[in-house]
A protein has these predicted regions:
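Glycine/proline-enriched, intrinsically flexible loops and inter-domain linkers
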Residues: 1-86, 91-580
């Protein structure tokens, strides 16, 4: 019979485990080499119990949760629990064999022993700017096989009994275009584990076997909390279909992401039957990422105070037919899977909005708008530079608040890449514009968040540009009469003649010349409620702040605003009353 632990001790241990995850996260961010990790913070860390269940994870990227939830069970399956030793570290990146979400996401896990007793694990995952493959940045819009996307790392040891295995590190570094940066980032990940293991050992020495008992109770508590919320919902089936734009010229037609959610008592089932089949293009979503998307959606709707751990997964059932785009078969390409993965929460939120009126949000930018620029001339000894940025967009609105502008949504939660960091690290790139894009937030009583317009000029010839995005065709939807958010777009401005060319949403390795400018516009977000009910004073403030144009204020909100001197704005009360 499991030992009963008092709730105060469980809560203290929960916060202790969270502090361990947060401390190791901070170590990686502070010591990593690449801007991907130290600026964008494309990193996630977790504490895992001896049985392989996640019990505490830092609140960073929801997209990275799926990989860490499966890494320890995969280690046990391949090596056997009895063959895991103190001082070991395991590494992987292959989503089909216990690794990351796509090949650039490298997960490392380390066991914590006290004497001969395995008392827990520490795991982290981080996005590396290049791990080989057909294009710089290891992420393209046209790969038709996983083998084109970089080196595949099954679950293997990189350290054994406190000793680095040099041959494994050499193999990884020889398969990247930027080996110095890769070595620095991998060292940061491994160094964080040295502290993480130490902290778990200290926790065990303090709490003894009660530590594992608290871990089990935390998982059980999260499951109970989710089931308790589900039990209050009306039984029934709730369905929604959203769409991915397609994938380049090869797949121009929309791809449906269809979910049917069944509520029965305290049971919740997500059925993706009817979703598009897998394709020979890199937007297939590995099943661990689909699982993470459901995990995120459940937690977002049911309470941010529910501890994020394996208990949430235990409270739900997922049906994702093998061979569909959200559960592809090996070796389907998955490099740009995040654009499709983003649509899973959108579909779930759309389905459950009628029974979650207080927490439902409209569709946000729903993309992972990626810009990769690669050329000669990196800082340090590496022969090339690879600039990788994910640009934010609009956040969804709800019944009680406007959407946030210029933020990552759903599965992504990376930080802004400051202009100063960009130009300091990448001296051949000049930022020409970085601002919110007027009128991209959907109109509503609560306005959707705005997308961003970003312009980057290249200062040398022979730079390759890859641009990956979505919602360039399908607008982010609104709720309860709210309007759609703006779509995204990629443009090239030629240095030679100033001509502007719109590019596809999956542009791969486009050659640029010195002085060419890449213009990226990210999607906005849908609005919530009748825009004519938005207080005129709020519309005025939106106009003053450049979020809504004078024309949109009149046409969409029914608010007439004057600007006779070009400086001061005022509401024309009579004209507004007539329109409304």
């Amino acid at each position: 019979m499991a030992k009963k632990i008092d709730t105060v001790t469980v809560e203290v241990v929960r916060n202790l485990l969270m502090s361990i995850a947060e401390e190791t996260y901070g170590i990686i961010v502070r010591s990593a080499y690449s801007t991907n990790m130290k600026e964008r913070r494309d990193v996630c860390t977790a504490v895992i119990d001896p049985d392989g269940n996640s019990v505490a994870q830092v609140e960073s990227l929801a997209a990275l949760l799926g990989s860490m939830l499966s890494v320890v069970p995969n280690i046990y399956e391949k090596f056997g629990r009895e063959n895991v030793h103190p001082g070991d570290m395991f590494i992987a990146n292959d989503p089909y064999h216990g690794g990351g979400n796509h090949l650039p996401d490298i997960v490392i896990a380390a066991p914590a022993f006290v004497g001969d007793k395995l008392v827990g694990w520490i795991a982290n995952i981080a996005h590396h700017s290049d791990i080989g493959g057909k294009v710089p940045g290891s992420t393209s819009g046209d790969a038709d096989s996983l083998f084109q996307e970089g080196i595949r790392i099954p679950v293997i040891r990189i350290r054994e009994r406190d000793q680095l295995i040099p041959s494994v590190l050499d193999l990884l570094l020889d398969n990247t275009r930027v080996p110095q940066e890769r070595e620095g980032d991998l060292t940061a990940q491994m160094s964080a584990h040295l502290i993480g293991v130490q902290r778990i050992q200290e926790a065990y020495r303090r709490y003894g076997d009660d530590l594992e008992a608290c871990m089990k109770e935390l998982v059980a508590y999260s499951e109970r909390r989710v089931r308790a919320v589900v039990a209050t919902l009306p039984d029934g089936e709730y369905s929604y279909t959203d769409y991915v734009d397609g994938c380049g010229d090869k797949y121009p037609d929309p791809l449906p992401i269809r979910v049917k959610i069944t509520v029965a008592g305290d049971s919740l089932t997500f059925d993706f039957t009817g979703t598009a089949q897998q394709i020979k293009a890199p937007i297939n979503v590995p099943y661990p990422c689909t699982k993470a998307a459901v995990f995120f959606s459940v937690k977002a709707l049911m309470g941010d105070d529910i501890p994020a751990n394996e208990g949430i997964n235990r409270a739900v059932n997922i049906i994702a037919p093998k061979g569909c785009i959200v559960n592809p078969t090996e070796p389907s390409p998955i490099g740009a899977q995040i654009d499709c993965c983003q649509r899973i929460p959108d579909a779930i939120f759309g389905a459950l909005a009628p029974i979650f009126p207080d927490t439902a949000v409209t569709a946000g930018n729903g993309a992972c708008t990626t810009t990769i620029l690669a050329g000669e001339g990196a800082i340090g000894t590496d022969s090339v530079f690879i600039f990788h940025e994910v640009i934010a967009g609009g956040g969804g609105a709800s019944r009680i608040f406007d959407g946030l502008s210029g933020v990552q949504v759903n599965m992504t939660n990376t930080s802004n890449m400051p202009i100063e960091a960009t130009e300091m690290e990448f001296t051949k790139i000049l930022a020409r514009k970085y601002e919110l894009k007027t009128d991209t937030g959907g109109e509503g009583e609560m306005r959707g968040g705005l997308g961003i317009e970003r312009e980057l000029e290249v200062l040398q010839d022979d730079v390759l540009y890859t641009g990956l995005g979505d919602r360039h065709k399908f607008h982010p939807w609104g709720l309860q009469g709210g309007g759609e958010g703006g779509v995204g777009a990629f443009y090239r401005v030629s240095a030679q003649d100033g001509s502007v060319t719109r590019m596809g949403h999956k542009t791969t390795s486009l050659p640029l010349k010195k002085g060419d400018v890449i213009r990226v516009i990210t999607p906005g977000a849908g609005g919530y409620g009748d825009p004519k009910k938005r207080p005129a004073a709020k519309v005025l403030q939106d106009v003053v702040e450049g979020k809504v144009s004078l024309q949109a204020a009149r046409d969409q909100y029914g608010v007439v605003i004057t600007n006779e001197d070009g400086i001061h704005y005022a509401i024309d009360e009579q004209a507004t009353s007539d329109l409304r």
